[in-house]
């Protein structure tokens, strides 16, 4: 069986903040809330249960109400009765049956929720971590980076960057706060923030810029 449920957060949330980060829907002619795409107040959980009672769990954060409808109406009939270890066939089946309206966005999010649950099932049946099923370890260590540094007053941004340096990070990712609609002046502000972070982390480190474009 396949069960879906959308959980909703009704507690305290961060109020909208201008230029918090750029928005993928940021257009030259549109003034919009810079945090609009980042309010994950709802979350979908997808449970796929085998005939033996083993439950795999998948999830989706983007448009969960629509993803639920997609899974319940279109994908569940395609998956029921299949062997979870035939995951490649199941994926292709879901993808090809939804190609007229899927192939990206909502369709792929829904397919992914089920696919994650299938991998969870396979991990539980084989009693192995899923990364082992996906090919296993390829290196002894994986470099990590500090990923936050959203647009904020320079002093606060530098203080945050300094805290990551003290933790030993050598790689960092920050966010641009001004997008296409802000024009050249907005890009200048992005550069100012990047320079401010560089002053703290030095030039022997890696600094990435997230534009959400």
What is each PLM-predicted segment?
Residues 33-34, 49-125:
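Metal- or metallocofactor-binding catalytic centers and their adjacent structured scaffolds
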Residues 141-213:
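Metal-dependent enolase-superfamily TIM-barrel catalytic cores that perform enediolate-based chemistry
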Residues 87, 130-133, 175, 204:
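Flexible, glycine/charged-enriched surface loops at secondary-structure junctions
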Residues 106, 115-151, 155-156:
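Glycine-rich, aromatic-flanked loop segments that form ligand/cofactor-binding clefts
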Residues 46, 86, 125, 155, ...:
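Ligand-binding pocket scaffold of soluble enzyme catalytic domains
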Residues 1-52, 57, 61:
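Structured beta-strand/loop patches that form or line metal/cofactor-binding pockets in enzymes
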Residues 40-41, 66, 70, 85, ...:
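Conserved active-site and cofactor/substrate-binding residues in soluble primary-metabolism enzymes
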Residues 37-39, 136-138, 199-201:
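Solvent-exposed alpha-helices and their adjacent loops that cap or buttress functional pockets
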């Amino acid at each position: 069986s396949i069960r879906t449920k959308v959980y909703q957060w009704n507690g305290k949330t961060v109020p909208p903040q201008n230029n918090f980060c750029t928005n993928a829907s940021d257009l030259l002619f549109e003034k919009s809330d810079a945090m609009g795409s980042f309010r994950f107040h709802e979350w979908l959980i997808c449970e796929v249960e085998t005939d033996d009672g083993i439950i795999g769990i998948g999830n989706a954060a983007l448009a969960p109400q629509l993803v639920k409808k997609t899974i319940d109406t279109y994908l569940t009939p395609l998956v029921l009765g299949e062997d979870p270890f035939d995951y490649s066939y199941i994926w292709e089946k879901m993808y090809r049956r939804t190609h007229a309206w899927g192939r990206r966005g909502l369709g792929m999010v829904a397919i992914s929720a089920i696919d994650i649950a299938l991998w969870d099932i396979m991990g539980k049946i084989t009693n192995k971590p899923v990364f082992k099923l996906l090919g296993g370890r390829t290196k002894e260590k994986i470099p990590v980076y500090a990923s936050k540094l959203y647009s904020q007053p320079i002093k606060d941004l530098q203080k945050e960057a300094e805290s990551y340096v003290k933790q030993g990070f050598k790689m960092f990712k920050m966010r641009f706060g001004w997008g296409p609609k802000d024009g050249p002046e907005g890009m200048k502000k992005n550069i100012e923030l990047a320079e401010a972070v560089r002053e703290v982390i030095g030039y022997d480190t890696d600094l990435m810029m997230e534009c959400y474009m």
